[in-house]
Amino acid sequence: MKDVILLVEDNVDDQELTLRALRKNNVTTEVVTVNDGVEALDFLFGTGRYANDPNRPVPRVVLLDLKLPRLGGIDVLRRLRADVRTKWLPVVIFTSSREDQDIIDGYRFGATSYVRKPVLYTEFLEAVRELGLYWIMRNERPPHAKDDA
């Protein structure tokens, strides 16, 4: 199955900036973008508008914003970790939040990593490049996670 990054981001400007940063850094992996927490869960669990898509890929990594409409990032994370199908899925919180409590909650509920979105364009490009290369090119999933996917 092909490698996919799931970007869960409601801000259109941040979506485009992330996609542009990946392209600019030659991370050619397909990126599926969803706009809120409910749509993220629908994609990952094959429900809602994704219910009849047998070719829906399992992402190599989820880049998850925290402040999302309908269902926040922490609630998405809690549901992913509670389900055997997604408990091993790498979830990187990728957010502009600088709140200590968000970092604590992210790790408490099973985030693989917490990355603050840099404000400066060049730093943002570098952060996205590093995330894309690490999770697609370097990271090895546990064998059972590959079987569960």
Regions found by a protein language model. Give the residues of each.
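C-terminal output helix
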Residues: 39, 119-132, 140-145
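Short amphipathic alpha-helix used as the core "switch/output" element in two-component signaling
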Residues: 49-52, 74-87
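Alpha4 helix (beta4-alpha4-beta5 surface) of REC/receiver domains from two-component response regulators
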Residues: 16-20, 75, 98-113, 119, ...
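Residue-level signal for the "D+5" position in two-component response regulator receiver
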Residues: 33, 68-71
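Acidic catalytic/metal-coordinating carboxylates
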Residues: 36-39, 57-60, 72-75
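Short hydrophobic/Thr-rich beta-strand motif most characteristic of the beta2 strand and flanking loop
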Residues: 28-35, 41-44
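Conserved acidic segment of CheY-like receiver
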Residues: 2-13, 18-23, 62
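Active-site residues of response regulator receiver
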Residues: 65-66, 95
